[in-house]
Amino acid sequence: MYQPEFPPVPFRLGLYPVVDSVQWIERLLDAGVRTLQLRIKDQRDEEVEADVVAAIALGRRYNARLFINDYWRLAIKHQAYGVHLGQEDLQATDLSTIRAAGLRLGVSTHDDMEIDVALAARPSYIALGHVFPTQTKQMPSAPQGLEQLARHVERLADYPTVAIGGISLARAPAVIATGVGSIAVVSAITQAADWRLATAQLLEIAGVGDE
């Protein structure tokens, strides 16, 4: 049963681009995307704070669900919609502080054991990856594939889920067909020959999410 210890999110979050700049956040919000994540890696809080502030302000202006990857203190300070954490960040993060601040929490998983860890934290949503081989980041685990993804989605039938990892425009329909509530994409948009067209096509497949 879906009883998170953090504020809930819609069961279907729809298309969920993960991008590394405020410029991309603004572009995608303007293109109709309503769930996004700002993921800037390996910088100190003071180096990313201005970008976090700007991204959160844009999210508010468009009434969107904007998640901040990793920089949870800044997300709390500036009242983001939510925070996304990887497994490696869970142990080093004060989840009770995020909870008390009223922020939603998303957690990455790569196998059944990590799903168990995520469920123990009772987050707002669980991300399932990586579905396909990905060039976006170095992954210690093997790709899950559609069959494993479908099994995880069935296991988490009451939970908002997000599929991530190597999801292209061509692969997106098969991913959505597993019943997953959202698809997170990176290069399918940011490296597309025509990002506006790619975004529109992905929105057609995954939707903007439930209200």
Swiss-Prot record:
It catalyses: 2-[(2R,5Z)-2-carboxy-4-methylthiazol-5(2H)-ylidene]ethyl phosphate + 4-amino-2-methyl-5-(diphosphooxymethyl)pyrimidine + 2 H(+) = thiamine phosphate + CO2 + diphosphate; 2-(2-carboxy-4-methylthiazol-5-yl)ethyl phosphate + 4-amino-2-methyl-5-(diphosphooxymethyl)pyrimidine + 2 H(+) = thiamine phosphate + CO2 + diphosphate; 4-methyl-5-(2-phosphooxyethyl)-thiazole + 4-amino-2-methyl-5-(diphosphooxymethyl)pyrimidine + H(+) = thiamine phosphate + diphosphate. Mg(2+) binds at D70, D89. Binds 1 Mg(2+) ion per subunit. Its EC number is 2.5.1.3. The keyword Transferase applies. GO terms for cellular component: cytoplasm. 4-amino-2-methyl-5-(diphosphooxymethyl)pyrimidine binds at Q37, L38, R39, I40, K41, N69, S108, K137. InterPro entries: Aldolase_TIM, ThiamineP_synth_sf, ThiamineP_synth_TenI, TMP_synthase. Its cofactor is Mg(2+). Pfam families: TMP-TENI. Disulfide bonds: none annotated. GO terms for biological process: thiamine biosynthetic process; thiamine diphosphate biosynthetic process. 2-[(2R,5Z)-2-carboxy-4-methylthiazol-5(2H)-ylidene]ethyl phosphate binds at T134, Q135, T136, G166, V186, S187. Signal peptide: none annotated. Pathway: Cofactor biosynthesis; thiamine diphosphate biosynthesis; thiamine phosphate from 4-amino-2-methyl-5-diphosphomethylpyrimidine and 4-methyl-5-(2-phosphoethyl)-thiazole: step 1/1. CDD domains: TMP_TenI. One of its GO terms (molecular function) is magnesium ion binding. SUPFAM superfamilies: Thiamin phosphate synthase. Keywords: Magnesium, Metal-binding, Thiamine biosynthesis, Transferase. It comes from the Bacteria. Condenses 4-methyl-5-(beta-hydroxyethyl)thiazole monophosphate (THZ-P) and 2-methyl-4-amino-5-hydroxymethyl pyrimidine pyrophosphate (HMP-PP) to form thiamine monophosphate (TMP). HAMAP family: TMP_synthase. Belongs to the thiamine-phosphate synthase family. This is Thiamine-phosphate synthase. It comes from Escherichia coli O6:H1 (strain CFT073 / ATCC 700928 / UPEC).
